[in-house]
């Protein structure tokens, strides 16, 4: 890694914490794109806890096989069947080995067996909802294996929407820049032949300033989010729609600067959770270290409380803010 980068997983991320609170067939699904087309899975976006990274699947064709392989045709179906056979073999092999062990080694193999049982049970649950997956699952297209980054991100949003609608997960993370050294996407599909890192350093392209370029990229992302919202809005759930019971958080690609300290970090929170969140407003908290200043952790506590978790803190407290109460939700967001 280059200076300033870290491969250390110090603790849980907010999506990992929510995954424990809102478990599903897949507690968490991470989908994204990376600079290098050959990157299949990245582990630098999400985590369930210290040194427990969560995968971000960066190839839509492979993500489709993992999520919808039980009802797929061709290669994806073959991969799903092969995965089941492999899990069955490994589970039985671990059981045989475990029976020959004692003490700490037996306990360790018991943990391995539990992991494989979890994976196999997940595959079984996918088989149980095949009708739903066939009815509401996505239809793969050339975008799923396209070398064009915008095609792949479009496909990942399609997969993510289908995963939510089919009940595969309650927690979805979509990333358009996955990988410690592979975040530097060039959005050629938007007609831009300049990478995001160069844009961040203020470079222009053709007749467009760095600000113009960022606006084009961000507008594209919001169009994708709007498409996701429309799909959720079309699904009835309870007395409303899936969108009524969903919160979407758009995290900006940058804080107060290209090489930032994250003292300011703009976010967009979409959805009101059935009226439990106050929406349609712009909120600007006082600057870092000032009276009534709040941290990103306070927003995350807000989300966890909405999900039903009894938490009043998240992550590590900022030692430079020792005189501030860093606990609790953002009351300004709660109805």
What are these regions (language model features)?
Residues 1-335:
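Ligand-binding pockets and gating/stacking loops
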